[in-house]
Amino acid sequence: MPGVIMNQDNINGRGLGLHDQLNGVSSAPAGSSQLGNPVGLHNGSLPTNGVQHPDSRGSDENYRTKMMLSASGDPPELQHIVQGFFPLAKLLNRSAQQCWNDLADLVAELAEIQVPSHDSNFSPISPNTKVLGNQSPENVRKKLRALEFAQKKRGEFIKLLVLSQWSRQAADVSRLIDIQNFIRTQHQAYAGALQCMGDMKRDLVRAQVANPDLNTALEVLLRGEVVSMPDLGYRPPKPLTPKSTLKKMRKINRVISTRLALHDDIPLAFQKYRVHDGRVTFVVPGEFELDLSIGEEDVTSQFFFVDIRFLFSPSPSIPAGRMLSELDIKINDTLRNGGLSECFNWLHNLILTNKINILARQASELSRSLWSNVLRSELLHRTLVLQYWASKPNTKSWLEIGIRRGPRESTIGGMRPPSLGLRWIRDGQEVNSDDVEFDTDSLSVDRLLRSAIALHISHILSSAFRRISEKLLYSNGSLSLHAYLTRTEPGDCQLDVQLTASRRLRVAIEPLSGAIVLAATPNTLERVDTDRNMDRSTIDDIVSRVGRLRCAAAIEEVESQVKMLGFISVSPRNVRIDARSLFPANVLRFSFFWHHHWERSWLLAATSSMDGDKWWVVQTPSADSVTINRSLDAAVHHASSAVRSAQVICNLLLPAEQPDYSSLADLGHCLSGFLAIYANARFLQDLQFIKIWPHLEHLRIGPGLQVPDLNIEYEATKLPEALRVALPAGFKRKTFVKKTIRLAFHGIDRCRKVAIMVAYGNLSTSFPALGDLVAEDDHSLVLQKTGTGFALRLLASPGYPVVVALLESLQRLECVLSVYEILRRKKMDARFLSLSRLGFAYGPNKELLAQLDIGETQPQLPTEMDPLKLAFRTGHLFHYRLSISFDHSNPHRRIQGPLASNLNRPTAEAGLDTLTEILSFTLPLMQALDRFMANPSRNESSIVHVTVRNATSFQIHYPYEKCRLRLVAHQHQNQPVWVLRDVLSFQDGSCEPEFKHKLQERLYNSKGTGWRGLGNGVIAEPDHIGDLLDELDRCLASTKANTTPKALDSRTSHDAPAANNQSPAIRPEKSVEAADMHGGFVNRNLQQKAGPASQKTDVITID
């Protein structure tokens, strides 16, 4: 009886009830007993075959009720049906509660789905310019699941709405149910009456007894026999003795053997038989043994069934009794009608059906026990379908066991009989089932399923093995991969994958459910194994998950190791790098690193894929416009919107052996070193003026974490104009360095936090004992003592190119060697040498020391360091300027300024060659001036001013005598000489007459050792210039003896300096005649053309 939903008003009696008025009869009150027994029959008892059955109320009460109803004339009241009714409010409460429970389950299910983080800056935009939001597969699946839940619950509540509207008319439907129940009860009463009458008639037949045969009974009683019964003359057989029994058995055996050998057509399946004990036993392997015998010797007579035994297990036993009798009858009928062939066919089909039923029963037992919810079995006619891994989505797999028929011929000939066949559908496709262990002699569904599942798992793991082994990491033997497969036990099938040098993964498939089981050693992060696509096949899922786990393990291992070396992990979002477009598509995991020692525009990236793990060097645009500290927060905020370059530098993330502290330190050293080398190679390639090898694309970290060296082709003449050093005027560029320069990395200076770069090269000219001139504490330059090799040490942050400094140092080295070569040619001894200065000794005994300094202007950083700007820049970036310095005891210190100026003047006579000649030429003069300084006999009246015009031109001024003399160098008969002449004081008469007369007499018209007068001057050899000055001093002393101090005071009050200045001083004079400032020995014409000087001159005051 279907249930009825009543609204609350009708249930509680607030509306019109069914008992208010039914069939025109007023119903009983709500509290009457009729509601307590709604199903009972109250219209009287039901008579059957004229017999009235009393009910619980008694016949008298029923009779009185009938009489009352008949007296009233109203029909009896219909039974009111309330069984199965329940209120609508209960249904609504249950539905609301169920909706709440389902919603809670949905929330928990959606929480388990991991949605990757979403960056709003990279959200896709629809054609209508609306942001689509996160469109990842996980997020879409969550939305679809929520939509399906809402749609389902909406349908349920629509049904509740329809029921609530229908329940308002439930009273009429309830009345109809009562009428239907009454009609059905009447039909049942009619049917019961007919059935009772039929049963009675059948029972009466058995009760009939035939009339007794009194005559035969009397004859038997009187005579003990019946004469009327015929006598057939049968005699009982004689009892058999053992001998006769044996004889008959042997006779039957001969008859059966003869018959089978000569007359009967024995089917192929019955070819194996034996005759014994008066019977023949046909043996069908794996099925049954059939015992038959004969009833007579006629060869055309049939065989008779004796016994049958099943040869497979488990096999049912045939119980004695009805079943055995029916089997006996059926076999004998088959033997009589069809012979042995038909008997075999019938028994064979019986056995096949029996085997299928046994397998079906085993499958049913398995599905209710160990294989619950994972095995489904269904018997269709004589085909058993076994679906394993039933809870697994996507494609299905099952086994079909049925009777195989077909025109397959046997090995002997003829058609093969039907047999049990196995059909294997693996992942929706039929495959060969020959390897499945299907033993029809020993039936076992469990063993069959295990064999099929083992083969299925072996297929999955072998396919995954084949696909993983095609990856480069496993094909070249970098990582190991082993598969253990079996055909019988699925739990023994497994795939061992080496993830990294220290981590391994075991892949297996749970035999019952088909779920993939991954076990990592040590345990890998579970969060990386969350992306499980249900639409993928199992093989694709295994390969994908193994790839993700391997790459995640590799990157995790690298991150944990390199962070101990001070590396900082950088998020690609902070540097605005689109890693998916930067790296190949097969890269599954990546991580960016930076170090606080490096330049901000360089990053290292570690990528991992199934084809290999690689280190990348990534160059981002310079962040000059952004102020960045070298702190953790600032280090990850690179101002880069794109990647300038990215290149693979190593195919190994960590050392091949088990990493320890030393190998990790080597890794950090190698990465920083390679970055330093690569930055220089990138700079040179962008410069496009200098060849390098190996080429930038072939630059890799060598075996054993060896930092490669960079070979540079160096030619100063082929450098861009900006990088060619501007040498001092008159300095000729000469090549001393061979073309090939090798740039190598030599570690990190931990104090300065810079990379140590060393450039190795060879000199084209061998200089003996040159290496001894470099100081041991000078680390910027090393010269080989026994060869031509040299090394330059450069410092810079890893990632900052040292190319500009290297090229400048090489040109500086050539400049220093050029100076050294000139000094050696001039017979001067070099005492020490560096890239910025060169010390040498000169003089007759090499007792005087001098130092040549090489200075330059510094480039403007950082814009000047851009290789593209340097390549097209006009003008030199570096300008060299030579200077010379002397120690305090060197007499040439007095003309140090003019000598330095003479080194850098753009004239033909200027230069280092001229400087060395000037040093030798002026040395006697400077020594003579030093003697003047050291003369203790000088007094106030013998002050002399010596003004240095240039290195070869001097003015001697005697303030008290108002006399000015000029001492210049001249060429006389191709020999350099000193010429002493008067300057203006003789012509204008300002000079003291007595002093003038003395000069004319003792110098101009006289001669001495190494000097002689010219009438208007004196010429002296360079080595005897001291003798001339001594004679001049004596001339002055003799003049002073004839003059008074007072007159001397009056004469010197206007032009003499203060008398209290007793020490030599250098001060400028403005009204003196300019001397020729050209370096070297000037000729007479050049000396006469010299004009007044526009620069300050030095005055040497000697007292």
Curated annotation (Swiss-Prot):
Residues 23-36 have a biased composition (Polar residues). Pfam families: Med14 (PF08638). Keywords: Activator, Nucleus, Transcription, Transcription regulation. Its main location: nucleus. It comes from the Eukaryota. Residues 22-61, 1043-1067 are annotated as: Disordered. GO terms for cellular component: core mediator complex; mediator complex. InterPro entries: Med14_N, Mediator_Med14. It is found in: Nucleus. One of its GO terms (biological process) is regulation of transcription by RNA polymerase II. GO terms for molecular function: transcription coregulator activity. Component of the Mediator complex. Belongs to the Mediator complex subunit 14 family. Component of the Mediator complex, a coactivator involved in the regulated transcription of nearly all RNA polymerase II-dependent genes. Mediator functions as a bridge to convey information from gene-specific regulatory proteins to the basal RNA polymerase II transcription machinery. Mediator is recruited to promoters by direct interactions with regulatory proteins and serves as a scaffold for the assembly of a functional preinitiation complex with RNA polymerase II and the general transcription factors. This is Mediator of RNA polymerase II transcription subunit 14.
